[in-house]
């Protein structure tokens, strides 16, 4: 089982995707401050995980709708900006265009030490609509992530902090044994506790911690 951001991907893919999208649709920059505010409030104990989920979920939905409405982002995938797309179709087209172009330019950020194997599981707080494409390109089909309703782009699950072990068991199975777990953060201690062996990743240096 591998954490994604900072572990096998060099950086934070959601932040990189956000800044990448701002190059084509500057309007999305308005969503940065609210997300940071929710994160700081949660970190300082002024908001519960449930409150952060609702707040971040609402901002994410607004952001994805801005992406879907962007004529410049639609052009990334070769779609005509006046193609008459509407509603759910427009959302899917816009997000797909952005995600595909992002990974066209960022797959080289996958760290060289990582060699995908068919039974690998990727565990991440990133969303399935973004991380799923990276997994597809790596030849992987098991992703435990935050999820978005593809019809409405509303967040249905935030795979974060204490939610991770619960979400892992829901997706992979309650009796699944983790032989090896790789992460870049001690915040993943609950997952480290579940694994037979665990490794801390810093850049391309890997240290066994369990």
Predicted regions, residues:
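Metal-dependent phosphoesterase signature
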Residues: 50-109
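Short, flexible segments with low predicted structural confidence
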Residues: 27-28, 85-86, 164
């Amino acid at each position: 089982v591998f954490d994604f951001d900072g572990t096998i991907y060099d950086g934070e893919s959601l932040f990189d995707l956000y800044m990448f999208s701002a190059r084509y649709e500057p309007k999305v920059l308005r969503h940065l401050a609210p997300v940071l505010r929710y994160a700081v409030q949660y970190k300082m104990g002024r908001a519960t995980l449930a409150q952060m989920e609702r707040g971040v979920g609402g901002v994410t939905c607004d952001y994805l709708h801005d992406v879907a409405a962007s004529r410049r982002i639609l052009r990334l995938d070769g779609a005509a900006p006046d193609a008459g797309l509407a509603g759910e179709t427009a959302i899917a087209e816009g997000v797909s265009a952005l995600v595909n172009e992002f990974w066209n330019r960022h797959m080289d950020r996958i760290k060289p030490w990582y060699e995908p194997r068919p039974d690998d599981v990727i565990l991440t707080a990133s969303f399935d609509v973004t991380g799923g494409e990276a997994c597809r390109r790596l030849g992987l089909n098991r992703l435990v992530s935050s999820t978005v309703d593809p019809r409405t782009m509303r967040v249905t699950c935030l795979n974060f902090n204490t939610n991770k072990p619960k979400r892992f068991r829901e997706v992979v199975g309650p009796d699944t044994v983790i032989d090896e777990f790789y992460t870049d953060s001690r915040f993943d201690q609950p997952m480290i506790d579940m694994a037979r062996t665990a490794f801390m990743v810093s850049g391309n240096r890997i240290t066994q911690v369990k």
